[in-house]
From Swiss-Prot:
It catalyses: RX + glutathione = an S-substituted glutathione + a halide anion + H(+); L-dehydroascorbate + 2 glutathione = glutathione disulfide + L-ascorbate; methylarsonate + 2 glutathione + H(+) = methylarsonous acid + glutathione disulfide + H2O. Residues 22-101 form the GST N-terminal domain. This is Glutathione S-transferase omega-2. The gene is Gsto2. Belongs to the GST superfamily. Omega family. One of its GO terms (biological process) is L-ascorbic acid metabolic process. PANTHER family: GLUTATHIONE S-TRANSFERASE OMEGA-2, PTHR43968.
Length: 248
């Protein structure tokens, strides 16, 4: 694996060369929760990969040949095949690469995890809206009430299942797909939103012990530094906390 701590490529940069045989490339951004999903799966399945970080405020022109809207993550293999949308990319990795399957083999259990993901679907947008409101000094009481309700819905799932993780007694795909937003609650200033959800707090504690989660954890001070620059529209935000030469 390479690229975890490489600087972002921006406008005017040269496109990277072909993807080497036996490696998959991910176009990513260190602080992006959607990229985080896919990187968790890459790490959990020990897939050989390289990371190309993209400056999302100053995107290279060539990157639009990888994704029509210039979003991350995007996977690219040595056959020049491109896969984007984070959930689709994660499922592709699970289907194509050997090792422990993160999605269940059983069709019903797989469908059930996708239904759980639908129950989660409002959390990313509500988290983002709360973050923006807090950073801009606006009242976010109603937004936090709405976010707490969505988290209560997830709490009820864990209570009903009486399991440590959303997919059962061991980590599976659904846990990795929702984790990035829970990791960000503290740095977003929203940690109190799980004060009323004891099962979710136990799940969070269990997730923090997972090797893939630990490997991709970003220090809170670095994340806060990124957010400070990001909300100043500073294109250097995406490289905050890195040192050394740009790797292209």
């Amino acid at each position: 694996m390479s690229g975890d701590l490489t600087r972002c490529l921006g406008k005017g940069s040269c496109p990277p060369g072909p993807v080497p045989e036996g490696v998959i490339r991910i176009y990513s951004m260190r602080f992006c929760p959607y990229s985080h999903r896919t990187r968790l799966v890459l790490k959990a399945k020990s897939i050989r990969h390289e990371i190309i970080n993209i400056n999302l405020k100053n995107k290279p022109d060539w990157y639009y040949t990888k994704h029509p809207f210039g979003q991350v993550p995007v996977l690219e293999n040595s056959q020049c095949q491109l896969i984007y949308e984070s959930v689709i990319a994660c499922e592709y990795l699970d289907d194509v690469f050997p090792g422990r399957k993160l999605f269940p083999y059983d069709p019903y259990e797989r469908a059930r995890q996708k239904m759980l993901l639908e129950l989660f679907c409002k959390v990313p947008q509500l988290s983002k809206e709360c973050l923006v409101a807090l950073r801009c000094g606006r009242d976010c009481t109603d937004l936090k009430v709405a976010l707490r309700q969505e988290l209560c819905n997830l709490e009820e799932i864990l209570e009903y299942q009486n399991t440590t993780f959303f997919g059962g007694d061991s980590i599976s795909m659904i846990d990795y797909l929702v984790w990035p937003w829970f990791e960000r609650l503290d740095v977003y200033g929203l940690a109190d939103c799980v004060n009323h959800t004891p099962m979710l707090r136990l799940w969070i504690s269990s997730m923090k012990q997972d090797p893939a989660v630990c490997a991709l954890h970003i220090d809170k001070n670095i994340f806060l530094g990124f957010l400070n620059l990001y909300f100043q529209n500073n294109p250097c935000a995406f490289d905050f906390g890195l040192c050394g030469p740009i790797v292209r």
